[in-house]
């Protein structure tokens, strides 16, 4: 497997575009992704009980066997907007279907931005028309820009691998910066591939991959009303997968997982106001569930995140988060490392160099390892530090 250029348009048969429709003052705000051959679609949606209109429509459409397009607007979430919001989301589907000549049941729709504000429908529909006209094999970067809200950088990646003498590609774009918390919430990610497989297998694979990637990130502990991860597989590589035992499936899942983790880490790294990425590794746990729960809990701890920002080796905040994660632990078995600096052994503090620990916490990517010494299950979660700028950004988000 190797990294390539092209994002969501790297796989065969995919086009994309991103345009400025006027929802935002000057930046791109409407994106369309289109598969020239109807693709098998799979998706995972936010677990927030309050779901935006586009999410409800996409949850219905994903039941269809085939998905040909994804339409997205940023700058307005179209959430908590009542019947007017549902009508607006349907109009987005109608306009996209008309422009591309496809059934509206083959379209996923997504929105992201401020909650509770009516969607400026005419601007969005005009943007959809412009985006459909601008669709190209080079449009992934523009689409990645058009789905951004408080993101500081667009997020896209693509990889390819060889199997059965053919080349398979997987590409993706994502957005997310604030309101990021585990359990499939607060971000959008769209992944394309030219491999072919049945819907049930694709959906199962996506769910497993999401649990290892997007569900393992946290920026601020808030779960959004709008977010989803979707994957479209159009089969144009000529490689068709029927079972999990096949070499092609194993290579595809590995590629999908790589793309998803790269996008998830990019979201965590770009957390609102963040200055560094935090990676928490929980090793030698009794179960995968326990390892994941503890890793997510530590990355979500505001006290720990603030300590990382201040380069303060306050490991007490880590062990405290381990303790309130809701899992059975034996403190006397636990070791904790800040990078390479061991600060806790068998539940007892060790003397360590504050300077060395500070150096570890000053890195762009801070790694914390929590060894439970009780089993063989491991998990990794990602987050970011908590800074003054996070408060500044969110104190005036609407205005």
UniProtKB/Swiss-Prot annotation:
The record marks 112-113 as: Involved in the stabilization of negative charge on the oxyanion by the formation of the oxyanion hole. It is found in: Cytoplasm. The record marks 185-186 as: Cleavage. It catalyses: N(2)-acetyl-L-ornithine + L-glutamate = N-acetyl-L-glutamate + L-ornithine; L-glutamate + acetyl-CoA = N-acetyl-L-glutamate + CoA + H(+). Keywords: Acyltransferase, Amino-acid biosynthesis, Arginine biosynthesis, Autocatalytic cleavage, Cytoplasm, Multifunctional enzyme, Transferase. SUPFAM superfamilies: DmpA/ArgJ-like. One of its GO terms (biological process) is ornithine biosynthetic process. Pathway: Amino-acid biosynthesis; L-arginine biosynthesis; L-ornithine and N-acetyl-L-glutamate from L-glutamate and N(2)-acetyl-L-ornithine (cyclic): step 1/1; Amino-acid biosynthesis; L-arginine biosynthesis; N(2)-acetyl-L-ornithine from L-glutamate: step 1/4. Its EC number is 2.3.1.35, 2.3.1.1. The active site is at 186 (nucleophile). The keyword Amino-acid biosynthesis applies. GO terms for molecular function: glutamate N-acetyltransferase activity; L-glutamate N-acetyltransferase activity. Pfam families: ArgJ (PF01960). GO terms for cellular component: cytoplasm. Substrate binds at residues 149, 175, 186, 272, 394, 399. Its main location: cytoplasm. HAMAP family: ArgJ. Heterotetramer of two alpha and two beta chains. Belongs to the ArgJ family. Catalyzes two activities which are involved in the cyclic version of arginine biosynthesis: the synthesis of N-acetylglutamate from glutamate and acetyl-CoA as the acetyl donor, and of ornithine by transacetylation between N(2)-acetylornithine and glutamate. This is Arginine biosynthesis bifunctional protein ArgJ. It comes from Carboxydothermus hydrogenoformans (strain ATCC BAA-161 / DSM 6008 / Z-2901). The gene is argJ.
């Amino acid at each position: 497997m190797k990294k390539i250029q092209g994002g969501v348009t790297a796989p065969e048969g995919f086009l994309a575009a991103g345009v400025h429709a006027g929802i935002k003052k000057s930046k791109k705000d409407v994106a369309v992704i289109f598969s020239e051959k109807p693709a098998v679609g799979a998706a995972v949606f936010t677990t927030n009980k309050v779901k935006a209109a586009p999410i409800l429509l996409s949850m219905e459409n994903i039941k269809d066997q085939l998905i040909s397009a994804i339409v997205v607007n940023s700058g307005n979430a179209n959430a908590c907007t009542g019947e007017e919001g549902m009508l607006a989301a349907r109009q987005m589907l109608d306009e996209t279907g008309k422009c591309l000549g496809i059934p509206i049941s083959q379209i996923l729709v997504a929105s992201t931005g401020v909650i509770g504000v009516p969607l400026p429908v005419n601007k969005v529909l005009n943007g959809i028309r412009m985006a459909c006209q601008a669709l190209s094999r080079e449009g992934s970067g523009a689409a990645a820009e058009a789905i951004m809200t408080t993101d500081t950088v667009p997020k896209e990646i693509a990889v390819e691998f060889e199997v059965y003498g053919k080349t398979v590609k997987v590409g993706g774009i994502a957005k997310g910066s604030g309101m990021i918390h585990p359990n499939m919430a607060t971000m959008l990610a769209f992944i394309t591939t030219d491999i072919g497989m049945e819907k049930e297998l694709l959906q199962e694979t996506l769910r497993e991959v999401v649990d290892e990637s997007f569900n393992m990130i946290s920026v601020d502990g808030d779960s959004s009303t709008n977010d989803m991860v979707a994957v479209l597989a159009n089969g144009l590589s000529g490689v068709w997968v029927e079972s999990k035992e096949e070499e092609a499936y194993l290579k595809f899942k590995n590629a999908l997982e790589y793309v998803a983790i790269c996008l998830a880490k990019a979201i965590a790294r770009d957390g609102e106001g963040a200055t560094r990425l935090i990676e928490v590794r929980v090793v030698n746990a009794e179960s995968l569930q326990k390892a994941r729960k503890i890793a997510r809990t530590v990355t979500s701890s505001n006290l720990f995140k603030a300590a990382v920002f201040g380069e303060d080796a306050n490991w007490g905040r880590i062990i405290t988060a381990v303790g309130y994660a809701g899992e059975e632990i034996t403190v006397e078995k636990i070791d904790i490392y800040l990078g390479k600096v061991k600060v806790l052994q068998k539940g007892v503090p060790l003397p360590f160099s504050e300077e060395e620990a500070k150096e570890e916490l000053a890195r762009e990517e801070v790694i914390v390892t929590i060894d439970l010494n009780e089993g063989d299950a491991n998990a990794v979660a990602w987050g970011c530090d908590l800074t003054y700028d996070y408060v500044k950004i969110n104190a005036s988000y609407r205005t």
